[in-house]
């Protein structure tokens, strides 16, 4: 009958409404398909797509923030190592060099060419039958070498005669080493095969100095400080290589720039330039046993004060470069964080 049919249709409508309601409760969506409400459905689709794009952009921006922060922390740590290297160089500068001793024997009375180095500078003089003349020739050669060298040996004579006038006395605020045993013996000093340093300059290497009547101080200490300095340079390079995030490192070398996009098309973006904060990138060279007057790399085991001062100047320049890089990274970080907050709104 008509009433029965009407009741059946009502039950079907109720069942359909219940199914729709249950579906909405299950999905949390009022509109589940274009059939429910075409306008709302496609508007929702567009908004979902926009939300997904923003989340992707925010992920990229967040990675950028973390990468910049890692680089900035790396620079801060490297700056501490540079300051420590400065401290070591200053310690070397304050370590005094001295060579002292009185010859055990009388100097040669025949004409003999004596070869020695003072702080790595080659010096030669000729002995004479007169000890006073020999001493004068030695001091003249030292004075001449001092004026032409890149490091001064100090004022005054370093060679003299003892109270008996028969033996040569050496008293220098410098590293004095003979180039061969014959030169050392010619001045009356006991020869030895043990060197006080491994200093090389202009192709000349000292070979004898340490003996019972001749001693040197400060060389070993400065060489040890030079090794500590070299170890710090290795740490600087390693630290720069470890300051990465998600495979991106902004301070281990140039050419590894990072581009952060702020919109879907990439038309709004920020390029963060990488820097080289390794030891070589900062212009810091390892200290070797050759001084700066040679073509070899290095600054002579910190033996010359002039070379140590050059190292300090290089460290100051490296510190300035790090400060500049940190300032640039800080500015970029501020921009990225600002855009991150904007994208979250």
Regions found by a protein language model. Name each.
Residues 1-345:
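Primary detection of the long, small/polar-rich alpha-helical "axial" segments characteristic
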């Amino acid at each position: 009958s008509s009433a029965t049919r009407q009741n059946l249709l009502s039950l079907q409508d109720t069942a359909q409404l219940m199914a729709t309601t249950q579906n909405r409760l299950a999905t949390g969506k009022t509109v589940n398909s274009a059939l429910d409400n075409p306008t709302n459905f496609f508007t929702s689709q567009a908004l979902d797509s926009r939300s997904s794009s923003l989340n992707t952009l925010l992920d990229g921006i967040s990675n950028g923030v973390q990468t910049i922060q890692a680089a900035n922390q790396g620079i801060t740590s490297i700056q501490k190592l540079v300051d420590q290297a400065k401290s070591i160089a200053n310690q070397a500068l304050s370590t005094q060099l001295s060579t002292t001793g009185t010859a055990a024997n009388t100097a040669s009375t025949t004409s003999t060419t004596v070869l020695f180095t003072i702080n790595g500078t080659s010096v030669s003089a000729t002995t004479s039958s007169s000890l006073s003349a020999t001493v004068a020739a030695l001091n003249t050669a030292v004075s001449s070498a001092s004026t032409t060298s890149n490091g001064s040996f100090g004022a005054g004579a370093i060679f003299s005669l003892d109270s008996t006038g028969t033996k040569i006395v050496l008293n220098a605020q410098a590293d004095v080493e003979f180039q061969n045993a014959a030169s050392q013996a010619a001045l009356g000093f006991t020869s030895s095969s043990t060197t006080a340093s491994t200093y090389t300059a202009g192709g000349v290497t000292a070979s004898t100095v340490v003996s019972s009547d001749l001693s040197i101080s400060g060389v070993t200490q400065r060489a040890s400080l030079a090794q500590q300095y070299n170890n710090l340079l290795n740490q600087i390079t390693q630290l720069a290589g470890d300051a990465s995030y998600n495979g991106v490192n902004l301070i281990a070398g140039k050419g590894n720039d990072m581009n952060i996009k702020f919109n879907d098309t990439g038309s709004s973006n920020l390029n963060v330039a990488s820097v080289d904060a390794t030891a070589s990138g900062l212009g810091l060279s390892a200290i070797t046993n050759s001084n700066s007057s040679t073509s070899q790399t290095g600054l002579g085991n910190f033996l010359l004060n002039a070379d140590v001062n050059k190292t300090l100047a290089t460290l100051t320049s490296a510190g300035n470069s790090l400060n500049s890089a940190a300032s640039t990274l800080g500015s970029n970080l501020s921009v990225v964080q600002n855009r991150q907050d904007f994208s979250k709104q």
